């Protein structure tokens, strides 16, 4: 876990980087899961559940963008595409 670092601060950085990497992976995984759940509900033509899943996915996209996990424009693009799918379901 400590790699090849000899300096105390470098050892600490390796440790914190590993913690952050695990946390970021967890958040990204939850984000992908939320998007997949939304798309599954759209696929089943379940408008009410899709709306709730859309809100959840949008929330997770915004949080990921605020934390710098994904670029804000990437989050915006994803939200736009999800909204388009939701609106297509209503029509």
UniProtKB/Swiss-Prot annotation:
<keyword id="KW-0687">Ribonucleoprotein</keyword>
<dbReference type="GO" id="GO:0003735">
    <property type="term" value="F:structural constituent of ribosome"/>
</dbReference>
<dbReference type="InterPro" id="IPR002583">
    <property type="entry name" value="Ribosomal_bS20"/>
</dbReference>
<dbReference type="GO" id="GO:0070181">
    <property type="term" value="F:small ribosomal subunit rRNA binding"/>
</dbReference>
<comment type="similarity">
    <text>Belongs to the bacterial ribosomal protein bS20 family.</text>
</comment>
<keyword id="KW-0694">RNA-binding</keyword>
<keyword id="KW-0699">rRNA-binding</keyword>
<dbReference type="GO" id="GO:0006412">
    <property type="term" value="P:translation"/>
</dbReference>
<dbReference type="Pfam" id="PF01649">
    <property type="entry name" value="Ribosomal_S20p"/>
</dbReference>
<protein>
    <recommendedName>
        <fullName>Small ribosomal subunit protein bS20</fullName>
    </recommendedName>
</protein>
<feature type="region of interest" description="Disordered">
    <location>
        <begin position="72"/>
        <end position="91"/>
    </location>
</feature>
<dbReference type="InterPro" id="IPR036510">
    <property type="entry name" value="Ribosomal_bS20_sf"/>
</dbReference>
<comment type="function">
    <text>Binds directly to 16S ribosomal RNA.</text>
</comment>
<dbReference type="GO" id="GO:0005829">
    <property type="term" value="C:cytosol"/>
</dbReference>
<keyword id="KW-0689">Ribosomal protein</keyword>
<dbReference type="GO" id="GO:0015935">
    <property type="term" value="C:small ribosomal subunit"/>
</dbReference>
